[in-house]
């Protein structure tokens, strides 16, 4: 193999190695972001359920609440 061809193959191998590393890094970042999205969706669903419960049973008017035990 000529020196020019060998240098070109070497350069392509280096580029490929860098691209593979970048792809792996991006994939890991995407996995972490999806995990965060899943967690946030679960939290949001919990908040929706709590809000629905509050809407169904609103808090009593402070005048309707029984007095504290020390009265």
From Swiss-Prot:
Gene3D superfamilies: 1.20.5.300. Belongs to the SlyX family. InterPro entries: SlyX. Pfam families: SlyX (PF04102). This is Protein SlyX homolog. It comes from the Bacteria.
